[in-house]
Design a protein with these regions (language model features):
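Cofactor-/ligand-binding subdomain signature composed of acidic, glycine-rich
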Residues: 2-48
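Gly-rich Lys/Arg/Thr-decorated short loops/hinges at beta-loop-alpha junctions or inter-strand turns
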Residues: 28-33, 88-100, 191-192, 236-241
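Conserved phosphate/anionic-ligand binding catalytic regions in large, soluble enzymes, centered on
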Residues: 52-73, 162-173, 328-338, 373-385
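Histidine-anchored nucleotide/phosphate-binding helix
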Residues: 107-121
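C-terminal accessory/binding modules appended to enzymatic or scaffolding proteins
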Residues: 230-239, 249, 414-452, 460, ...
């Protein structure tokens, strides 16, 4: 993955965060100042007041009020007599999402402005910016830091490009030199974050919005968008779109305006909010205005702003099955519902895609993981799977009847680990397998035994961190029936 793969950026109405992109491509410090101008420093009270008046919420998915985060950090600093840390979450671990990478790559100074505002207002010890190790945006950010002076020491930390690496607790752990996975228990970063200090952690777009608001002031900022959710929203439109793009649009913009701009073929459904989001129908999409409340009215979620039309020419159940398999492989492996429950869910959804009558198995597997994980990963994965079966009920029925939907899986829902990226997958020689079951004992997060006692596992490429377990399973097979193959090399 390289910076050249960042999709085009466009806007509906007057751009704010993306202003100057068309003229300059990437905004260095001089271009940034020409486009956006300067801003005045804020006190902690002014920072909270500004965030409150513009109803600023986190743009990483959860939508938590930014002012409440700031208050919590200030209270914790006073209580513990410690300085705070400012953390910018620019990891963007979801494969379909590009909005933060687009800003990191083309407008990094706006992110740094927002972080600098918060750091100066709170008299922070340090600013830490977390980015994925895929290389997208990191060089641009480093160049931007070299051009300017920050109010306190500022460093960039890279984390593995995994789905769960961007979870707040996982990012804090990674910065602290621990495993880049969510903590097994609830920990408030505002109390105990980076280096044990109170930590203000928010998403890259959130800090960019803060920088825009500091320049415009609350009245002008609120002049665009909905009264209850003012300002613009950064969206990623991908999937079955002829012109996929990162789009900046005012809240309240009709969803169809955004989709039509990108040439979207919705087909039977649209995924909103990413791989922990939900599917909505094409008819529902016609009624939605871009906002958290707008998506909630049709049972969806804005999340981190991902809009993925499935299209009319791909198999939605097969696409969904691949994503659930991927999400199962992204487990941190630290709780049973995630480590064992998600592979069960993935197998059940895969069986549905292959024509098996496994709907009840999907519901049962989803029910067993819901609300029981150490983080939100099991809940989000089960929500994605169940909504797919609901929205694509006609396709599910066609598969169950043995006829199939007549459409192929085309990779409309992107995955980071494919044959093209060098990922390997397991293969079974059925002529050799005697059903000993040893493989499932050493790698239960990958392999389970079917009702006949034979190994069953996803047919998608394995993420690198599961290869070791797969290799152990291969080595213990007494019949030499199990192999790790490279699909790109013709299965060798």
């Amino acid at each position: 993955m390289s910076t050249q793969q960042v999709p085009p950026v466009t806007a509906i109405g007057t751009p704010r965060i993306t202003a100057g992109y068309d003229e300059y491509g990437r905004l260095d410090l001089q271009a940034h100042q020409e486009v956006h101008g300067g801003f005045a420093a804020l006190s902690s009270g002014e920072l909270i007041g500004l965030a409150d008046r513009i109803e600023l919420r986190g743009r990483g998915g959860a939508g938590f009020p930014f002012a409440r985060k700031v208050r919590a950090v200030i209270d914790s600093c006073k209580r513990q007599d410690l300085p705070p840390i400012i953390v910018v979450n620019g990891t963007e671990g979801e494969p379909p999402s590009w909005k933060d990478k687009a800003v990191l790559t083309r407008g990094p100074h706006l992110i740094l402005d927002g972080a600098a505002l918060a750091a100066a207002a709170l008299d922070a010890e340090e600013i830490v910016i977390g980015v994925a190790d895929d290389g997208v945006g990191q060089n641009s950010l480093m160049a931007a830091l070299a051009e300017r002076k920050m109010p306190c020491p500022t460093r960039i930390v890279t984390v593995p490009h995994r789905f769960i690496s961007g979870e707040g607790g996982a990012l804090v752990r990674g910065i602290n030199g621990e495993a880049h996975i969510p903590p097994g228990r609830k920990v408030r970063s505002s109390d105990n974050g980076v280096m044990g200090l109170p930590t203000l952690l928010s998403n890259a777009e959130t800090y960019s919005q803060l920088a825009i608001a500091a320049r415009l002031g609350p009245w002008e900022y609120n002049s665009v968008g909905l009264p209850e959710e003012p300002g613009t929203v950064m969206l990623t439109v991908g999937g079955a779109s002829s012109s996929p793009a990162v789009v900046e649009a005012p809240s309240g913009t009709p969803l169809m305006d955004v989709l039509n701009m990108c040439g979207a073929d919705i087909g039977p459904g649209l995924l909103v909010g990413g791989y922990h989001g939900k599917w909505i129908t094409a008819k529902q999409a016609e009624t939605v205005m871009i906002s958290r409340k707008g998506f909630a009215k049709v049972g969806g979620t804005l999340g981190a702003g991902m809009l993925i039309p499935i299209g009319s020419k791909t198999c939605p159940i097969g696409e969904a099955a691949q994503v659930v398999q991927y999400l199962a492989g992204e487990s941190a492996g630290q709780c049973g519902p995630c480590r064992l429950g998600l592979p069960d869910l993935a197998r059940a959804v895969t069986l549905v895609s292959l024509g098996g009558n496994a709907l009840e198995n999907v519901r049962q597997a989803a029910g067993l993981v819901k609300g029981r994980g150490a983080c939100s990963h099991p809940d989000g994965t089960s929500r994605f799977a169940l909504s797919a079966l609901e929205v694509f009920a006609k396709d599910v029925e066609a598969h169950a009847n043995g006829e199939g939907c007549g459409k192929s899986v085309k990779g409309i829902l992107p995955l980071p680990y494919t044959a093209e990226t060098g990922a390997r997958k397991l293969a079974l020689d059925w002529s050799r397998c005697d059903g000993h079951g040893l493989c499932s004992a050493v790698a239960p997060e990958i392999i389970r035994l079917d009702h006949n006692g034979f190994p069953a596992f996803p047919q998608t490429p394995l993420p690198p961190w599961l290869e070791d377990g797969a290799r152990k399973a291969v080595n213990v097979c007494p019949a030499l029936a199990l192999r790790l193959i490279d699909p790109a090399a013709g299965g060798h």
